[in-house]
Swiss-Prot record:
One of its GO terms (cellular component) is extracellular region. Disulfide bonds join C42-C45. It comes from Brevibacillus choshinensis. Its main location: secreted. GO terms for molecular function: oxidoreductase activity. Belongs to the thioredoxin family. The keyword Flavoprotein does not apply. Residues 1-27 form the signal peptide. This is Disulfide bond formation protein. Keywords: Disulfide bond, Oxidoreductase, Redox-active center, Secreted, Signal. It is found in: Secreted. Residues 28-114 form the Thioredoxin domain.
Amino acid sequence: MRAKWLWMTAVGSLLITVLTAWGWAAASSQDSKIVYVFSDSCGYCQTFRPTLETVLQEYPQTSVERLDIREERDLKEALRLGAEATPTIFVVRDGTVMDKLEGDVAEAVLRSFFQKKS
């Protein structure tokens, strides 16, 4: 009986690994990602952060890449995306900016932005 359980566990793990890899590849080519450009020294960013965190709680499946423009690598990526102000939220698919939202916007505006993207 133990051998059967071990075999099922091994097959189950392999199946999960294969499905996870297949699902990740499919998701990464079709899904958008959210990129949040900010700076801790930006007053607007500090005001906006609680609003962003509140709205993101409604979208637990959404992962957000955070770019702090005080870090050189993050600044380069933010500039590549076209950031002109902080805070800015980009929707990026396959490296291409699909949409962006700039500034310390109201919670209703941010929620509407996320609803359009989901």
